[in-house]
């Protein structure tokens, strides 16, 4: 990417192609997709089921390799990196939030949020302080000793958000994070996400079917015939 440092997006997808084989047929999901994600900007990915939303997020988040094309993270190409190198980038630069919270049931909210930092080898005192700070920011200061089964759906998802940003990532990917929530709770969780984007200047790409929530994002994009298109 021949740009000045100030012009480099946090994540840039360049000519991404991804195909799957079903029996004797080849299904092209992404076909030359391009997308730039900038610091402090929220982007909604709105597209029908089966259009490639999750595939795009997995490729952008280095969970899956494209068949062709390149994924740049802070200007550095990643597709030729080893699995260990890609894992390290995911741990330091990338956060994920899913439709299902995926919290560890045997651990408290605090311990779940501490986990990504502990994996990186940070001191326990540092991880406790950071986890408490994030949970308090998300309105969960009085719930830190509760296990997932003792939390409401909205609280569980806010803990998942806290865990995703525990390592201060550069980019946050969210795949239908409010899909299992009622409208009121979904609104609360969505506000928490967008507030974090502005407060931390993280880039965010969120796949959602909720057009009302998507309308509050800085940008809206879709997938048509395997390519990314900007929406009004």
From Swiss-Prot:
Q: Where in the cell is it found?
A: Cell inner membrane
Classification lineage: Bacteria, Pseudomonadati, Pseudomonadota, Alphaproteobacteria, Hyphomicrobiales
Name one matching Pfam family. Answer: ABC_tran
Ligand binding (ATP): 47-54
Q: Which UniProt keywords apply?
A: ATP-binding, Cell inner membrane, Cell membrane, Membrane, Nucleotide-binding, Translocase, Transport
Task: Provide the coiled-coil residue spans.
Answer: none
Say what the protein does. Answer: Part of the ABC transporter complex LolCDE involved in the translocation of mature outer membrane-directed lipoproteins, from the inner membrane to the periplasmic chaperone, LolA. Responsible for the formation of the LolA-lipoprotein complex in an ATP-dependent manner.
The record's comment on protein family reads: Belongs to the ABC transporter superfamily. Lipoprotein translocase (TC 3.A.1.125) family.
Q: How does it assemble?
A: The complex is composed of two ATP-binding proteins (LolD) and two transmembrane proteins (LolC and LolE).
Q: Does the keyword Ribosomal protein apply?
A: no
The record ties this protein, via InterPro entries, to: AAA+_ATPase, ABC_transporter-like_ATP-bd, ABC_transporter-like_CS, ABC_transpr_LolD-like, MacB-like_ATP-bd, P-loop_NTPase
Write the protein's name: Lipoprotein-releasing system ATP-binding protein LolD
Q: Which residue range or ranges hold the ABC transporter domain? A: 11-231
Q: Please state the protein's primary subcellular location.
A: membrane
Q: Name one GO cellular component term.
A: plasma membrane
GO MF = ATP binding; ATP hydrolysis activity; transmembrane transporter activity
């Amino acid at each position: 990417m021949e740009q000045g440092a100030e012009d480099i997006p946090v994540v840039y997808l360049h000519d991404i192609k991804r195909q799957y084989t079903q029996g004797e047929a080849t299904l092209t999901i992404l076909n030359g997709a391009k997308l730039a994600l900038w610091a402090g900007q929220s982007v909604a990915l709105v597209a029908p089921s089966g259009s490639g939303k999750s595939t795009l997020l997995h490729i952008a988040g280095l969970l899956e390799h494209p068949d062709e094309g390149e994924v740049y993270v802070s200007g550095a190409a990643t597709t030729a990196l080893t699995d260990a190198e890609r894992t390290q980038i995911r741990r330091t630069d990338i956060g994920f939030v899913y439709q299902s919270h995926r919290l560890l049931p045997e651990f408290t909210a605090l311990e779940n949020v501490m986990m990504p930092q502990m994996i990186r080898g940070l001191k326990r005192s540092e991880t406790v302080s950071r986890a408490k700070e994030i949970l308090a920011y998300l309105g969960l200061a009085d719930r830190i000793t509760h296990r997932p089964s003792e939390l409401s759906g909205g609280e569980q998802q806010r803990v998942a958000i806290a865990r995703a940003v525990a390592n201060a990532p550069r980019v946050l990917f969210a795949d239908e994070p409010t899909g299992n929530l009622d409208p009121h709770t979904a609104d609360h969780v969505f506000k928490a996400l967008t507030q974090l984007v502005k407060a931390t200047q993280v880039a965010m790409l969120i796949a959602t079917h909720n057009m009302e929530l998507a309308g509050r994002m800085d940008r809206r994009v879709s997938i048509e015939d395997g390519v990314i298109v900007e929406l009004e």
